[in-house]
Curated annotation (Swiss-Prot):
Lineage: Eukaryota, Viridiplantae, Chlorophyta, core chlorophytes, Trebouxiophyceae
General function of this protein: Located at the top of the head of the small subunit, it contacts several helices of the small subunit rRNA.
Source domain of life: Eukaryota
Protein name: Small ribosomal subunit protein uS13m
Similarity remark: Belongs to the universal ribosomal protein uS13 family.
Cellular compartments annotated: Mitochondrion
Subunit details: Part of the small ribosomal subunit.
Keywords: Mitochondrion, Ribonucleoprotein, Ribosomal protein, RNA-binding, rRNA-binding
Gene: RPS13
Length: 119
């Protein structure tokens, strides 16, 4: 197991799949990271040397927002919508679909399960 950005990554997975488990990194960013490392994306994470592991961690921390930074940024954006009393902020408060989806059908289960934002 490799520990990068507060996430345990499985050694047996390919590099681009393992990196995608870090919150804030998708497959596209993981492929870019593999290009910078000079390693094939299909290479298993366990096959990398310790130097490459440290370089991987360094590339991710310096060039990408991950983990709690992304969560905080998203939370601040939602809170901004709530503070300016926009329609989208109101929908977030109510726990309803924000982007114009129907609320008669599928949103019923979401309304039951979703935690409502408190002001």
């Amino acid at each position: 197991m490799v520990y990068i950005q507060n996430t345990h990554l499985n050694d047996k997975k390919q590099i681009y799949q393992a990196c995608a488990q870090i919150y804030g990194l998708g497959h596209h960013h993981c492929l870019q990271i593999c290009d910078v490392l000079g390693v094939s994306p299909e290479t298993r994470l366990g096959m990398l040397s310790t130097g490459q592991h440290t370089l991987l961690a360094q590339i991710i921390t310096q060039n990408y927002d991950t983990g709690s930074d992304v969560r905080r940024f998203t939370r601040q954006n939602i809170q901004r919508l709530v503070n300016i009393h926009s329609y989208r902020g109101y929908r977030h408060i109510q726990g309803l679909p924000v982007r114009g989806q129907r609320s008669h059908g599928n949103a019923r289960t979401v309304r039951k399960l979703k935690n409502v934002i408190k002001i």
